[in-house]
Amino acid sequence: MATAANQVGRITQVIGAVVDVQFEGHLPAILNAIETKNGENRLVLEVAQHLGESTVRTIAMDTTEGLVRGQDVTDTGAPIRVPVGAGTLGRIMNVIGEPVDEQGPVKADDLRPIHAEAPSYTDQSTEAEILVTGIKVVDLLAPYAKGGKIGLFGGAGVGKTVLIQELINNVAKAHGGYSVFAGVGERTREGNDLYHEFIESGVNKKGGGEGSKCALVYGQMNEPPGARARVALSGLTVAEHFRDQGQDVLFFVDNIFRFTQAGSEVSALLGRIPSAVGYQPTLATDMGALQERITTTNKGSITSVQAIYVPADDLTDPAPATSFAHLDATTVLNRAISEKGIYPAVDPLDSTSRMLSPLIVGEEHYQTARLVQQVLQRYKSLQDIIAILGMDELSEEDKLTVARARKVERFLSQPFHVAEVFTGSPGKFVDLADTIKGFRDLCQGKYDHLPEAAFYMVGTIEEAVEKGKKLAAEAA
């Protein structure tokens, strides 16, 4: 029997992104990467099916224009492997680990295969611990689990990107951890903007290297479905390497829906019978294979923040519905809140977290969070009355509730480090203890004497008191 690696086969058929390759006396394993030249470019094909005894059906990781029948193809004997390690920070790679930022080759510690088993039960950590982000509204009302999965919901222009940048910045500063950003099937323009914004806001250095905190792996909308279906795994592989070195890693996926969508396209190309709503029959398996690798081990953790596009706002669509099964927390961004000028525009009543339990966060944190939600919910239910009859018709108690709720709303805003360029005010990282104390005292009426404006865009409650004094002095 011939050795597995470096066996040469020939292309027998090309149909769009699907390429059939014939080998003599040797069949590459399923998921093996096989390579060929397409003009000047290296084209990687991933084995998806065995057809008969000598032919494999593969999915191309790049465009197949220019391929011809009879062309030589080499079996690498292993799955797709991507560079990992500190050399990837500040760089943009594609699905096969090639740099696409025109900054020279990626200096890698090692190459790792993108297909791997999820950590075994014995390697996983069972402690429920929260990841402090320094963002008040997140830490108080929908805290992130270390090694958990967070769904980020929001339309265009409500601040998803800025929130992601601030999380990357804060995790690097507070935990010394790195981040990996996987751009899956989104706009190339957004990917380009994000790269330059990271450099402007100091998250990354141009050309990577010392001082960069985030690695970027892109497979954008213009890529064939094979690349979009695998790029999340390439990004995850980079994150797993940092985790195995003992780090707390943040792993961003934008957008997890596109991962499912690409899987559906690949499935159709391979001729599988579709299931509900035309999705692939292996939808839950594909999603599970990705999500189960995102976890906390005895060495470190990968906490994942996944932007989730909901097609036609239908939460029961199989793609988002399958994602929800894996989430520990949801962060919902609301346009109505951003229109008030309150950033981050996180909806305090819609965002949820499995971690918000007295057994995990403690009684004081839990009670404070519930008190804040209670005040805001009461205000929400009174808004119709206020709109029709005005504030004067409310009882004294309700007037007080409304006044406190409006202060709470404003206190949930805070200046971000990465937005200093636009706002001119320095960013604030707020410790969890300060957040809890501030909101508890505010809801209990300790700061009823301060004006609403004092609570807008400040960090801790002490800053609000200072701002209140300053406003009073200016008014006097």
UniProtKB/Swiss-Prot annotation:
SUPFAM superfamilies membership: C-terminal domain of alpha and beta subunits of F1 ATP synthase (SSF47917), N-terminal domain of alpha and beta subunits of F1 ATP synthase (SSF50615), P-loop containing nucleoside triphosphate hydrolases (SSF52540)
SMART domains: AAA
GO molecular function: ATP binding; ATP hydrolysis activity; proton-transporting ATP synthase activity, rotational mechanism
Tree of life domain: Bacteria
GO CC, any one term: proton-transporting ATP synthase complex
Keywords, ordered alphabetically: ATP synthesis, ATP-binding, Cell inner membrane, Cell membrane, CF(1), Hydrogen ion transport, Ion transport, Membrane, Nucleotide-binding, Translocase, Transport
Positions with a binding annotation for ATP: 154-161
Broad enzyme group: translocase
Subcellular location: Cell inner membrane
Catalytic function, reaction form: ATP + H2O + 4 H(+)(in) = ADP + phosphate + 5 H(+)(out)
Listed EC numbers: 7.1.2.2
Membrane topology: Peripheral membrane protein
Coiled coil residues, start to end: none
Main location: membrane
Family: Belongs to the ATPase alpha/beta chains family.
Assembly description: F-type ATPases have 2 components, CF(1) - the catalytic core - and CF(0) - the membrane proton channel. CF(1) has five subunits: alpha(3), beta(3), gamma(1), delta(1), epsilon(1). CF(0) has three main subunits: a(1), b(2) and c(9-12). The alpha and beta chains form an alternating ring which encloses part of the gamma chain. CF(1) is attached to CF(0) by a central stalk formed by the gamma and epsilon chains, while a peripheral stalk is formed by the delta and b chains.
Name of the protein this chain belongs to: ATP synthase subunit beta
Organism, scientific name: Nitrobacter winogradskyi (strain ATCC 25391 / DSM 10237 / CIP 104748 / NCIMB 11846 / Nb-255)
Organism lineage: Bacteria, Pseudomonadati, Pseudomonadota, Alphaproteobacteria, Hyphomicrobiales
